[in-house]
Amino acid sequence: MTVLPRVAIGLFGGSFDPVHEGHLRLARALRDELQLAEVRLLPAGTPPHRAPLAAAAADRLAMLRLALAGEPGLTVDERELSGRLSGYTVDTLAMIRRETGPEAALWWLVGGDQLASLDRWHRWRDLFGLAHLAVAVRPGFDAGSLPPAVAAEWQARQATDFANLPPAGRIRALSLSPVDISATAIRADLARGGDGLGHLAPAVRDYIHLHRLYRSESPA
């Protein structure tokens, strides 16, 4: 008889620069569709493959906490901001797996664009030994357009038998309406003195204006 994992945790990493309604919709979808008691949002440090972020880590963390206030089951995990991790997803997941133990079900959220480049991630195949992947795909998503190695994993790892789900190694697509919100466009609007195109929680918008964040970024 298969013993079901006693703990199931959703994990959503990102720069959150700034956190906006699109992020919150994704986190809620992960929580609700997979019936998770907890979804942890992990703000990134300085990613190893990207330019420095626009807002300081302390500000991104403060905005994320404001955005999640009153959101049941959505919490902040700030470990990647410590500077002690590599910034690679596989290393973060390995640390969380050590903390939760082998029987916890971990779900790492990725977008369809991230899935399409998964084979370029650091030690990407090791991810499946550490967690499941929950994929936020847009309507009309075509798995046939994925790189062959990723498409093979997509086909082989589909989560179907939830009564006997292992702690890691499966893939599930989340059913979402389109989320077409650009953090770049939000920052450009804020640089012009705008309100973030209406995509920011009031507390986050007020924090940005109070601390004069994103004012130096040139509008795009």
Curated annotation (Swiss-Prot):
Annotated keywords: ATP-binding, NAD, Nucleotide-binding, Nucleotidyltransferase, Pyridine nucleotide biosynthesis, Transferase
Reaction(s) catalysed (UniProt annotation): nicotinate beta-D-ribonucleotide + ATP + H(+) = deamido-NAD(+) + diphosphate
Coiled-coil intervals, chain numbering: none
Enzyme Commission no: 2.7.7.18
GO biological process: NAD biosynthetic process
UniProt cross-references to Pfam families, sorted A to Z: CTP_transf_like (PF01467)
Pathway info: Cofactor biosynthesis; NAD(+) biosynthesis; deamido-NAD(+) from nicotinate D-ribonucleotide: step 1/1
UniProt GO molecular function: ATP binding; nicotinate-nucleotide adenylyltransferase activity
InterPro entries listed in its UniProt record: Cyt_trans-like, NadD/NMNAT, Rossmann-like_a/b/a_fold
Matching PANTHER family: NICOTINATE-NUCLEOTIDE ADENYLYLTRANSFERASE-RELATED, PHOSPHOPANTETHEINE ADENYLYLTRANSFERASE
Family the entry assigns: Belongs to the NadD family.
Protein name: Probable nicotinate-nucleotide adenylyltransferase
Gene source species: Laribacter hongkongensis (strain HLHK9)
